[in-house]
Amino acid sequence: MFIELVHIGFGNILAMNRVIAISPPSSAPIKRIIQESRTKGFLIDMTNGRKTKAVIFTDSGHIVLAALAPETITGRLSISRGGAVKPELVDDKLEL
């Protein structure tokens, strides 16, 4: 199985084949999901103490917090795939 690793800032690397969605943390439902996953022990904070700019949902049910913007992360994914991924905004949500 091929594992695609992408740098998500400050020395943190994420396996992108496990990612379901990337979202900004600004909405109330996303903030609620972050709090619930923190209490259940499914939250992975990769911000290194910086402001959370992206919330990454994985297929294992874990929630990953990143200090890079969703556009930056998908841009790095696009570069690693040779430009094969074209992220676009649909209803203010980033879709691959």
Curated annotation (Swiss-Prot):
InterPro entries: RemA-like
A Pfam cross-reference name: RemA-like
NCBIfam families referenced in this protein's UniProt entry, alphabetically: PRK04323.1
Family: Belongs to the RemA family.
Protein name, UniProt field: Putative regulatory protein DehaBAV1_0033
